Amino acid sequence: VPVTLHLEGADRLAAALRRSPQVVAQEQVRAMTRSLLLVEGDARRNVRQDTRQLMNSITHRQRMAGETLVGEVGPSVRYGAYVERGTRPHWPPRAPLEGWARRHGIPVYAVQRAIARKGTRARPFLVPAYEKNKDAIVRLFAAAGARVTATLATLSGGHA
């Protein structure tokens, strides 16, 4: 004897499921944007300022890598990585040091020689910004998941 089941509201559930990728994507982008802005703001505050060039270069971007939303925060100036991580001893080029040396009243050659002997000390600004905000980032994505669930429940005629 065949059994026939009739699922009431199946059409609303199917429609909600069809919309779920857009709902999930919208909430992911929202949580990612807020997360990136938190890290970007603290990274900017963490940077020691001379000309503000490094601070002003810190920005964020989002991109898709296949099915994965990727968020990145960082400086657009090349020397940002050297400030974050420091450097081993090396002989640096003169031109990038001239302005700094002049503002600090130090001969460029003396700065070059010091870097050649000792390298430069790391002055992390980005990693501490992430570390400070990682719990808040987890909460932002958890809240996004809750909003997705509530939205899909509403769209399917259920209760969140």
Feature locations, PLM:
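Short, Lys/Arg-rich flexible segments
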Residues: 1-160
